Structure formats: structure tokens, C-alpha cells
Amino acid sequence: TEKPINKAPFFFPYWRTGEQYIAVQDIDHLLQVFNYKGELVFSKALEGPILGQPQVVDLYNNSRLQLAFATSHQLHILAVNGKSVKPFPIEFKSPQTQALGVFDYANNHNYRFVTTQNNVVLMWDKNGKQVKGFQMKPTSSPILNTPNHLRIESRDYISIPEESGRLHLLSRTGEERLKIKEKIDFSSAQWQVETN
């Protein structure tokens, strides 16, 4: 790149050959993708920095991979030639405050793209439509991290930590699945799921 990059490079496989491609974004928000030889595959100007790392998805269940990511104002899905997959990008009404979450509940490529706007979580399908079946109420304090999907036995849980120390464990519809009364210090907490 001609300008300094603003975050660590992201590696992902090129679907035709399996070779690793490298994505970087410079300080002017130009996303550039290079092949393993260092040759530029594409560059795309974005309206802001990518939040977190891009996610690799297979929208059409045909092994042709795409990159999904969010900036503070848009949800993007790009093909490996740099073109936006229609109908993306999706413009946000309010700024995105966390990296994009990508859920594939049944491992069937029926993705849910999860966006966080301060204390509101929205879910989008692969057609760029807001998922009407997900109705989470706004949290009382800002959301601390990207929502995460966990599967324990046959149940799905969406974990959403708040700055206040509250942890939400929700169902796929956004309803509280498990109520946690205790406050958690997320700054030092390392937690994991154990099954017996």
C-alpha cells in the first residue's frame, strides 16, 4: 500500500485455489486485497474504518466466499473481486459501535448479520432485510462487545455483555433465555461454557 495501514492484516482463502489472500485497510479507509504473490487483486474506498475483523461467509452455499464487515455507517458484503454483493452495503440509521457479528445457527449458510448501535442490537438476513423475528429490547447501558452465538446441547444462546456488568443470554428471537442477576466485571473476566 502507499499509505500506512490502520490495523492488522486479515488473511482469508481464495475460493478457487485455497491460496491465502491478504486484506489491509489504510489510514484513508482504502481496503486493498493482495494475492499470495503480493499482487493487488482489488482496492475499494470505504466511508470509514472496518470495525473488528472481516468475516468470511459463503452466502450462496457454493464455496465462493465473500467478506462481511461493518464500518460505523454501513454493513458490507464483498465478493473476492471487490464488488458489493447486492443489496449491500446497507446504510445504518445510527452509528455501529461494535464489530459485525455473524451467526450461522444450523451451519447451513443461512447467516444472520448482527449489528450493535450503542445499546440496540439489530439482526439482518443475507438478503439485507432486518430479521423481524428478532426483537431484543434496548439495553440499559452501552453494549460492551460484539454479540456472540453459543450452542449448548440443542439450545442457542446469544450472549450480550453491557458496560454496567449485566450479561444477557438470549434466544434466537431476542427473548431472555437465562436471567443472570449478578453483575460481572468484564474487564478481567474470562468465561467459558463447560458441559458435563
How does the language model describe each region?
Residues 1-196:
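Extracytoplasmic/lumenal domain signature
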